[in-house]
């Protein structure tokens, strides 16, 4: 965490910001927010508001032009490697892995922006839209079933901060896999798997 120009980041005690993430300046992070390693959240030229229940995954960048405020509304889900630059992301919207959302764009509530999508400046995406491509194009509406699936995935990230605070710690690696090593249980399925 870094103060800048008199602005000190504000991070709710229930949030988890990985030690390898960088949060700078005029940033406000709400309850149960997850920020992954390698994320850069730069409130140096403007403000960044990350509402309760959002997640900003590994290697994401959030930034803006001078004087702009970036707002991630409640339960927004920013996938691995995505860039949000000077945009507004609506409540319970998902930005897919390595997608880019540019200045003054708005992603409507409950929308899903596909992986590798490029949302150009000023684009206004209506609520509950599925958006793909470069440049981005709305291809269909988010069904109730798809929204429930997305919300379930975000809930996993909303539970993660408490689990990380409880059990994440530096360690020395083992040199071999021990007998009887525990396995992770399957607690979520891909969209395709839910459809079959």
Label each region the model flagged.
Residues 1-10, 44, 52, 58-60, ...:
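Glycine-rich hexapeptide-repeat left-handed beta-helix
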Residues 6, 11, 15-64:
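A positional/architectural concept
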């Amino acid at each position: 965490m870094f103060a800048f120009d008199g602005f000190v980041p504000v991070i709710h005690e229930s949030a988890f910001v990985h030690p390898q993430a960088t949060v700078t300046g005029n940033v406000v992070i709400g309850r149960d927010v997850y920020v992954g390693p390698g994320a850069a959240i730069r409130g140096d030229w403007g403000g960044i508001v990350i509402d309760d229940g959002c997640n900003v995954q590994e290697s994401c960048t959030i930034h803006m032009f001078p004087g702009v405020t970036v707002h991630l509304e409640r339960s927004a889900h920013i996938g691995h490697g995505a860039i949000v630059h000077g945009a507004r992301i609506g409540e319970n919207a998902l930005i897919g892995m390595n997608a880019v959302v540019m200045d003054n764009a708005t992603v409507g509530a409950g929308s899903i922006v596909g992986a590798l999508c490029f949302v150009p400046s000023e684009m206004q995406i209506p609520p509950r839209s599925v958006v793909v491509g470069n440049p981005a194009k709305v291809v269909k509406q988010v069904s109730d079933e798809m929204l429930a699936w997305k919300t379930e995935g975000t809930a996993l990230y909303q539970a993660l901060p408490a689990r990380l605070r409880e059990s994440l710690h530096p360690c020395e690696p083992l040199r071999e896999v021990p007998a009887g090593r525990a396995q992770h249980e399957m607690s979520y399925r891909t969209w395709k798997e839910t459809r079959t």
